[in-house]
Amino acid sequence: MATLRVDEIHKILRERIEQYNRKVGIENIGRVVQVGDGIARIIGLGEIMSGELVEFAEGTRGIALNLESKNVGIVLMGDGLMIQEGSFVKATGRIAQIPVSEAYLGRVINALAKPIDGRGEIVASESRLIESPAPGIISRRSVYEPLQTGLIAIDSMIPIGRGQRELIIGDRQTGKTAVATDTILNQKGQDVICVYVAIGQRASSVAQVVTTFHEEGAMEYTIVVAEMADSPATLQYLAPYTGAALAEYFMYRERHTLIIYDDLSKQAQAYRQMSLLLRRPPGREAYPGDVFYLHSRLLERAAKLNSLLGEGSMTALPIVETQSGDVSAYIPTNVISITDGQIFLSADLFNAGIRPAINVGISVSRVGSAAQIKAMKQVAGKSKLELAQFAELQAFAQFASALDKTSQNQLARGRRLRELLKQSQANPLPVEEQIATIYIGTRGYLDSLEIGQVKKFLDELRKHLKDTKPQFQEIISSSKTFTEEAEILLKEAIQEQLERFSLQEQT
């Protein structure tokens, strides 16, 4: 058995003494005095910041929202079932932040940026604060590039630009999510990173959206942030900020991003629940006084950056649900006043089979034609006015027994215009095909057809144009202008298709 000599013991002790590092750590510790309904009240956290992360003894995390004289109100980021009265709470000294990286593309995550798709961990070397200040005035430039949605009604009459905030508003089951997801599908090959944030949705609905993205190949450039209806209110409140932080990461790396918030009504309800449990004074519709700031600080993060910052952009499409078409409720009016326009979806139009059920008359884009290519402006300039006049005339025609020939022709043209705006779900159209479609409708080529024949004729014409006149697409995509040459090619294709179509109908 080996024995240690005195000099060896002396040497070992000296080495240990030299290695000794006297480190004094100060931790901000408190005690739980009350816990329940996703809220904990803590005493003893004297030097905590508003919004600081705290950690409970059993591992649950929370955010300090109420800083009162005698206690601190914490919202829990979990169920908190194992937290006991009297247990210790430690302040972390950090504000809520998430890891960010390119590895998040194609993944489904929760509000804490943890993967929930069962495909393993996500490796990230950088992190971003969940809540960061919006770009200032000097950091921005005006919106001038179009963000094509693939939906004729939007791209022609309510255009959206890169860096814009456009609200999608309507009753439940009117196709709000379908408009948003179709916009994501249309970004394929456009070098746009998409973030879809599902707040308080049914798990089956989110699964359906994710399946559609996989089937259409959209998951390659999309991140899905999902907090279902059974998630704690804190996580539903945080989910949009997590999505915004991920989109900002790409925006500041000179990329174009699109973020969908589906929907902000649910986030406001989660925030109302948290605020009432924290005993904050309720205001209109029992929402807290700062619910406007909740949404304004989120939506102001969408921007088109200037050339010094790389000209990246973040386009936001928030969704808000209305009750029986009441857009004068608190949350709808708040978000309408923050955004750069709104797309109204009508339950009446949806039930009448007009889908997407966009009410073009009261929908508006405050960026307007600045976010359209010149070719679209040339062709679709008067289409919104024509549709508005048609809607007015149609309402009048219900009560008038006899109409003059001009009014009858205007009604017939309006019905065909409305028919060409119909599109099936997950079927976005490239801008060249949209221009051809609108040209046919506004120039009266559909007037000779029955309304039931319009869809079939347009489908066949688009295929015929692509197969026999590929130069048309090349001219529009390269020059962004509806040139005389493009018009001649389109007219030839229309005449050929009209002849073929009349022969088909005769046989």
Curated annotation (Swiss-Prot):
Subcellular location field: Plastid, Chloroplast thylakoid membrane
Residues binding ATP, per UniProt: 170-177
One of the GO biological process terms: proton motive force-driven ATP synthesis
EC number of the protein: 7.1.2.2
Family of the protein in this entry: Belongs to the ATPase alpha/beta chains family.
Oligomeric and partner information: F-type ATPases have 2 components, CF(1) - the catalytic core - and CF(0) - the membrane proton channel. CF(1) has five subunits: alpha(3), beta(3), gamma(1), delta(1), epsilon(1). CF(0) has four main subunits: a, b, b' and c.
Function: Produces ATP from ADP in the presence of a proton gradient across the membrane. The alpha chain is a regulatory subunit.
Name of the protein this chain belongs to: ATP synthase subunit alpha, chloroplastic
Gene that encodes the chain: atpA
